[in-house]
């Protein structure tokens, strides 16, 4: 995402131009891996890594070297692999559709995450629609994150709004 911000001023969730360029870049990387595999008789693959440690380390290094670049080095971490940035407001279905083409290009591994803001048990139909959309769009490995709480007194695990549904503690 930040590479696209540097090159065209927007990431792949923000414009068609950035979306196309992002796919061109990763397609070129995949073609290079395939060519080297054929040339050397070895297995090379393209991995879309969720390298959490590197994303923070690299942005600090780049900020020291290049200064603060809006939309690039002004955050604490870089966006992993081909993901739409977590701060960008986008529907789960659009995010899936934008990230899915990268799964076919990254034969060494990939994952797409969907972040829910509530308890999926309260809307299982929507949860199922997200999973089906992932399948239909070609998401090879998908994950759905949602909030979960744990009451330290009774040990209840689940969504706790204002009151624990098990022991009714309100602290």
What residues fall within each predicted segment?
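Long, C-terminal-biased catalytic regions of enzyme "large/alpha" subunits
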Residues: 1-170
């Amino acid at each position: 995402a930040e590479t696209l911000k540097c090159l065209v001023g927007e990431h792949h969730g923000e414009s068609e131009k950035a979306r196309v360029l992002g796919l061109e870049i990763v397609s070129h990387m995949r073609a290079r891996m395939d060519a080297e595999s054929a040339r050397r008789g070895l297995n090379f693959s393209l991995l879309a890594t969720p390298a959490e440690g590197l994303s923070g380390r690299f942005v600090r290094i780049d900020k020291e070297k290049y200064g603060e670049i809006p939309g690039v080095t002004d955050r604490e971490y870089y966006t992993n692999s081909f993901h739409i940035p977590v701060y960008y407001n986008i529907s789960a279905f659009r995010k899936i559709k934008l990230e899915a083409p990268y799964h076919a290009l990254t034969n060494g591994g990939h994952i797409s995450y969907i972040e829910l803001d509530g308890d999926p048990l309260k809307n299982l139909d929507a949860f199922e629609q997200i999973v089906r959309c992932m399948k239909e769009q070609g998401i090879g490995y998908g994950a759905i994150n949602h909030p979960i709480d744990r009451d330290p007194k009774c040990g209840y695990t689940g969504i706790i709004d204002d009151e624990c549904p098990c022991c009714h503690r309100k602290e």
